[in-house]
Structure formats: C-alpha cells, structure tokens
Amino acid sequence: MRREFYYQDDTSNKFWTIELQGNECVTTHGKIGAKARETRKEFPTAEAAQGELEKQVAGKLKKGYIEGALSAVPAQVKPDWTTMTMSDEVFWSIVRLFNWKKSGDDDAVIKPAVAALAQMSEADIARFEDTLAEKLHALDTEAHAREIGEEAYQPGKHFSVDWFLYERCAVVANGRDYYAAVLADPKQMPKDLEFEGMLSVAPSAHERKTGHDFDHVTPVSYETYSNTAGWPNGNSG
C-alpha cells in the first residue's frame, strides 16, 4: 500500500510518497501538481525494507509532513503580509523566505524576505529589527564565542567582534529550531560560517517601502560584548 504525505508552509507545497514492492522501498517526491521524481532502493529482505519505510515515515512526520491522500490536499494559502502584525511567529516566517539556492549572493538570498517585510507597516519593520537584535543579543556570550571555529574567542588574543556578530546572524538565518538548539548548547555554533546579510533585511525593507534610510535604534544592542551577562569575566580580546 502506498502511503502519501504532503507539506505546506509559506514557501513550500510539496508531496512525498512511499511504498514497498517486494524487497524494494519506492519513494516519490516533488512539488504538488508537478511531475514526481522516483527513487528505488533494494534491501536483502522484505523485513529490512519495511524497517526502512518506517524510518523514513518517522523522519517525514518529524519534519512536519502530514499523511493524507494527495487528491484531497487543500490549496496552498499564500500569506497576506499586509494584514499581519509582527510577532515572533511572523519573524520566523519572514526568515523562512530566504532563498538559499542563491547562496553566495546575500542580497539575492534575502530578496523574498525583504519583499514580504516591505508589505508590512513601518512599525512592524522596526519590530522585526528589534526581534533580530534580541536574538543576536542572547547569543552574545563568551561560551558561544569560543565555539565558532578558527576565529574563536581566546582571552588575550585577537578576536573579531564583527565576525562573531556575522556568525550569530548565520544562526538566526538558519531558522527557529536551529537557533533554539544553538542558544541552548553553544557547542552547536556553526564553524567558520557567517551571514552578514541578515542585518540588511529590515533596512532594505524600510527603504523599499519609504524610499528613506532606516535610522531605527533597537532597545538592546546586538554588537559583540553588549550582553554583559554573557561575558561575566569581561573581555580581553
């Protein structure tokens, strides 16, 4: 029996199916309405194939896929950003719009997010920046700075405050779940990875909406060392 699953969010509208054909595990996937791509994997026994099926199904459910007939999948509802008020949930929805297929070109990566945020009010754009600052501020700790790879913080040695900021930006840019994991466990900080473009989302959206520069000052600073509680020994970098 073929099992069918689908996943929808602000940017995704895709399906995945899986079934056993003898000792083979057969999966298909793709965008809803588009031609499916098929993958086949053969196993020594039917029991081994069944184990693989159960493993893959569990993985898809964990990622948020819903099991249901593809013929009955509801139409994808595109978000109306003009009616939304900035919140933590909306903040992460904006971040999910980043187009990582354009990696290497920060402006292109953030372009869909900038376009969405620019549809919201000026106050909401400012609140997006406030939320970003709060999240970057929370990551501004010595424990996190010690886990960023080659440029890691070491007392008494040169330490790039800008690089650490851009590494923290990469954490936020990779979404809510990753951010929460890194915030709880500094050892999960990315190594030698930055995303300075995160800092341009609100300013670019504001300029697109108003034609003016963004001069908003956030209640908390995201600059390195601003979170004094995260640097109980001060800094000597």
Locate the predicted segments by residue.
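N-terminal domain-onset segments
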Residues: K78-H144
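Intrinsically disordered, low-complexity charged/polar segments
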Residues: K62-T82
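Basic, alpha-helical nucleic-acid-binding regions used in initiation and control of genome expression
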Residues: D177-A181, D185-G237
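Core of folded catalytic or high-affinity ligand/protein-binding domains
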Residues: A115-D192
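A short, surface-exposed interaction/processing loop segment used at functional sites
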Residues: K31-E42, D185-E194
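Short, hydrophobic/aromatic-rich segments at coil-to-beta transitions
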Residues: M1-Y6
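A short, charged, amphipathic alpha-helix used as a generic interaction element across diverse proteins
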Residues: P44-K62
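Short aromatic-glycine-(Arg/Gly/Cys) micro-motifs in beta-strand/loop hairpins
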Residues: D10, K14-T39
